[in-house]
Amino acid sequence: MDSQRNLLVIALLFVSFMIWQAWEQDKNPQPQTQQTTQTTTTAAGSAADQGVPASGQGKMITVKTDVLDLTINTRGGDVEQALLPAYPKELGSNEPFQLLETTPQFIYQAQSGLTGRDGPDNPANGPRPLYNVEKEAFVLADGQNELQVPMTYTDAAGNTFTKTFVFKRGDYAVNVNYSVQNAGEKPLEVSTFGQLKQSVNLPPHRDTGSSNFALHTFRGAAYSTPDEKYEKYKFDTIADNENLNVSSKGGWVAMLQQYFATAWIPRNDGTNNFYTANLGNGIVAIGYKAQPVLVQPGQTGAMTSTLWVGPEIQDKMAAVAPHLDLTVDYGWLWFISQPLFKLLKWIHSFVGNWGFSIIIITFIVRGIMYPLTKAQYTSMAKMRMLQPKIQAMRERLGDDKQRQSQEMMALYKAEKVNPLGGCFPLIIQMPIFLALYYMLMGSIELRHAPFALWIHDLSAQDPYYILPILMGVTMFFIQKMSPTTVTDPMQQKIMTFMPVIFTVFFLWFPSGLVLYYIVSNLVTIIQQQLIYRGLEKRGLHSREKKKS
């Protein structure tokens, strides 16, 4: 095993990873079940099956804070539009990113209210409540840290239901407080609910290109319970009426996409039911229903929940609810990606540039992995030294493969050489590289983050393809500087074209990821020369490259 064959191993691992990404994107996995979780299939799959009504037309009111620009329908009090002023739709654009939307082309809403036997949102009790508001536009004024948007509804029996949205400066978490005044002579039984519904298919104006082979990130639903910290639930699974039905205390439900998320977090000590539903017309939902609460005659009951609507900022999400920060799509290597991101963020706090932070973390990671790299090159050098003996043995034994294998293993044992010693360090390093891939792909902090010169967005591909070409050049130099024992003509051709193949692959990768690989390759060249000098002193390497 030598350095050029390592390139082939890397290529195979890389292609395998891409195939796995495509498979993950296409398949419809069944949610894992645990003791307190059960998954059922519902035929109708409608929100009404869960006791949650469909929304209707009311008056639209607007709410503006320093970080949110929402439109709320007074019919039910659903959030039908959500703009994020701090995050432009595109680099250089003054148009804010739109997370929630209600148009003929696309539906994405955050619904909430009071259902249950006596809840005004129970379909059995008639249309959804038409709330009264004191004005049609609410604005968080300068110097104001909190904004409350109260909405009231009084039913035919004289019971008053108040739904109050509470916004805080700089916060994407919105508290939704409910007050129920029982004016009757019998207890009122009500349950809070929160539901997120969205069109499965993206229209052109919503498709950010994050589903291509290089930029695939998860878009779908998710939930969390004390037993299951973070479980994804694909939209296609919901559309197939294979629906979720989980009873749990605590937790949350969410809808995710690259960089942004919405989530409902129930705030109560009771049991909540988490569900998904196929609403028809290409729309799916995930939501929760809280355990019923009794409000006695003449009394006032209070309930609350929290809506997250905004970017996936890990530290802020973690402060809102346990494990909500796991919605950042770091894939199955999140336990490596999260510490790497914390390190990257710490470095950024000093240098102030995410591109330079990536360069520094690359040096740190490669420095930590240097002992593995050295062991890999040492093992390969020992294998090269044995090649003359192995070749002579093959000529002596001819086609006797069994004796060849036996004597080769005896030779390895006598020379204290592990034939897989060059592979193991490489395989151990791959999860770290993949974790960096997920980290750079899923971190909102890198969205529209500039580096230098022509790189104005580290989360987007290089518009001039300069970085991918530089990456290919560094691979070419690594290949030319590496000793080789490859004699097979086909393998030689593959090695020759490997830098070109990787360059083509990386044309569509985010600039931040390509920058990492360029710096990593440069570090490889430096480490390679240092290791070769040490091997020369031990007689395990010669500067004169063997001809094949």
Swiss-Prot record:
Q: Which domain of life is it from?
A: Bacteria
Q: Which UniProt keywords apply?
A: Cell inner membrane, Cell membrane, Chaperone, Membrane, Protein transport, Transmembrane, Transmembrane helix, Transport
From the record, give the transmembrane residue ranges: 6-26, 350-370, 424-444, 458-478, 499-519
Q: Show the ranges annotated as biased composition (Low complexity).
A: 29-42
Asked if Chaperone is a keyword of the record, the answer is: yes
Give any single GO term for biological process: protein transport
Q: What is this protein called?
A: Membrane protein insertase YidC
The gene name reads: yidC
